[in-house]
Amino acid sequence: MTFLFQLALAALVILSFAMIVGVPVAYASPQNWDSSKRLIFLGSGVWIGLVLVVAALNFLVV
């Protein structure tokens, strides 16, 4: 269970760093907004899901 928690936490951190860089770049380029909008919403949904998974696993591990 601890390994799964660490894996989910690492995925959350990596996705957070990717979105910190990617979202401002996507907002700064108006010509690709249609394709970027879908990617931003997908990344946001995955991020929220990972936060909930990490919270649940943290409850089970500790």
UniProtKB/Swiss-Prot annotation:
Q: Which InterPro entries match?
A: PSII_PsbZ, PSII_PsbZ_sf
| Annotated compartments | Cellular thylakoid membrane
Give the way it sits in the membrane.
Multi-pass membrane protein
Task: Specify whether Thylakoid is a keyword of the entry.
Answer: yes
Entry keyword set: Membrane, Photosynthesis, Photosystem II, Reaction center, Thylakoid, Transmembrane, Transmembrane helix
| Protein's GO biological process | photosynthesis; photosystem II stabilization
Top-level taxon of origin: Bacteria
GO cellular component terms given for this protein: photosystem II reaction center; plasma membrane-derived thylakoid membrane
The record ties this protein, via SUPFAM superfamilies, to:
PsbZ-like
Q: Where are the transmembrane segments?
A: 8-28, 41-61
Similarity remark? Belongs to the PsbZ family.
Briefly state the protein's biological role: May control the interaction of photosystem II (PSII) cores with the light-harvesting antenna, regulates electron flow through the 2 photosystem reaction centers. PSII is a light-driven water plastoquinone oxidoreductase, using light energy to abstract electrons from H(2)O, generating a proton gradient subsequently used for ATP formation.
Assembly, per entry: PSII is composed of 1 copy each of membrane proteins PsbA, PsbB, PsbC, PsbD, PsbE, PsbF, PsbH, PsbI, PsbJ, PsbK, PsbL, PsbM, PsbT, PsbX, PsbY, PsbZ, Psb30/Ycf12, peripheral proteins PsbO, CyanoQ (PsbQ), PsbU, PsbV and a large number of cofactors. It forms dimeric complexes.
Write down what this protein is called.
Photosystem II reaction center protein Z
Gene this protein is translated from: psbZ
